[in-house]
């Protein structure tokens, strides 16, 4: 889930060239840094990357295009090196550094826009569910009935921002049939954020969470997110978020390290597992204050 996550900053400009889909033009590639499991190259208005995972993903992206879903990559085909070609989403990426310090990430406008974007995505995806259930996906289906296609990692660091607001979402490698609420837990966790620190609006800095000072504001923002999505705040939203962090953030990092995955081993060495374990303990201690 987290292992091998792509970073967003540019590394170098490579002078490799390739033909575009029409075969009529050569474009230079700019390699994106940070993808230890997959190199990603930008060329003009397209992104070229090694194909990851299941064949259903391309069908899903084509379906979203047919449904007119804006702000997601379009699948354009396969290049001569066997890499998938996707449209590039212009804008700025934020939130990969935790804690997120950019003021726009803590604004009500951003939070509401995230909720509305996820609702549009889930509504557009729901019609693909009957076909999707015929395929094998990278992530297992949930035990409960599926109601949409989950992005699988809809955290703020996978959104594209313009003018301080989220306008696009990329990295659909973890997409799978699932439930809307399960998919929303990652957005909720990363956007509030549901962590042991909080954003001080007066100082515009992060500080330690205080139940007396911060519980009401955190509750307000959680309810704002779900209201913007178009549903009442589910009573089990914090419980599901804790389960998601335990299973996908902590569990898969441990499993990957045990299997020798160098990226997971590095992330644990850097303290990321310890961080998410603290987040999990924080949710279990204080989550009841926010619903």
Locations of regions flagged by a protein language model:
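Active-site acidic catalytic loop and adjacent metal/ATP-binding pocket
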Residues: 38-42, 139-185, 193-196
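Conserved kinase catalytic-core helix
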Residues: 99-135, 147-152, 157, 168, ...
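ATP/Mg2+ or Mg2+-diphosphate-binding catalytic cores
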Residues: 249-291
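ATP-binding glycine-rich phosphate-binding loop
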Residues: 16-43, 52-54
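A conserved alpha-helical element in kinase catalytic cores
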Residues: 36-37, 44-124, 128
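Active-site activation/catalytic loop segments of kinase-like enzymes and analogous catalytic loops
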Residues: 184-231, 246-260
